[in-house]
């Protein structure tokens, strides 16, 4: 045991300097609207995110989806999170998100809810890793300069914990950062998170710091 605090290097996402141990407000549907984000910034959040936004809603110009793109200068740094199950709508949604001026565009490959994952979006994408990787590659190519990040899980279930493979393949197509929920889709939000597996991903020499 040491009384000295652990020293962490300052965190960066692409060229975005976030300092030592930044506090992130996760994107949450029906929670992280502009008022809530503003309040969390006031109380110390370093990075905030919009609610996740449907790519189908954006390309159809659905008012509810377009409303979620609205961000303010006071929120920065701020990320916009998108989700969907088809490559072309996701690439177009990423372009629309970039036009709103966020600091980060995040792809949701982690939502376990049946109405999302059951259609192949969110964590449902973990059942088709080649599609997940190709979608991510196309999104990275679709935007001009905004860093693209991904949120995902350990795998679909205990027999398919493939996050180590996924992390390397997503890194290879150009993501700037990866957030891992330490459970499988089958667990949803139940049971223990597997911090050991997250640590293996982080400490893999093939994975950039």
Q: What does each of the following model-derived ranges do?
A:
Residues 2-3:
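Serine residues within intrinsically disordered or low-complexity segments
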Residues 7-209:
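Flavin-dependent oxidoreductase catalytic cores
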């Amino acid at each position: 045991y040491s009384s000295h605090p652990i020293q962490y290097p300052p965190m960066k996402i692409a060229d975005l300097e976030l300092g030592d141990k930044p506090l992130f407000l996760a994107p949450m549907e029906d929670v992280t609207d502009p008022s809530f984000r503003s309040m969390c910034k006031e109380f110390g959040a370093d990075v905030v995110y919009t609610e996740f936004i449907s790519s189908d809603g954006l390309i159809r110009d659905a008012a509810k989806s377009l409303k979620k793109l609205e961000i303010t200068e006071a929120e920065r740094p701020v990320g916009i999170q998108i989700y969907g199950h088809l490559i072309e709508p996701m690439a177009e949604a990423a372009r629309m998100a970039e036009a709103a001026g966020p600091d980060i565009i995040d792809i949701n490959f982690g939502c376990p809810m049946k109405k999302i994952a059951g259609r192949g979006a969110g964590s449902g994408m973990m059942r088709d890793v080649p599609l997940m990787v190709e979608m991510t590659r196309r999104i990275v190519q679709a935007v001009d300069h905004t860093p693209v990040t991904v949120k995902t899980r350990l795998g679909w279930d205990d027999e398919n914990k493939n996050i180590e493979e996924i992390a390397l393949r997503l890194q290879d197509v150009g993501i700037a950062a990866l957030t891992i929920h330490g459970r499988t889709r089958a667990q949803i939000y139940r049971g223990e998170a597997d911090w050991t597996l997250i640590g293996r991903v982080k400490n893999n020499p093939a994975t950039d710091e």
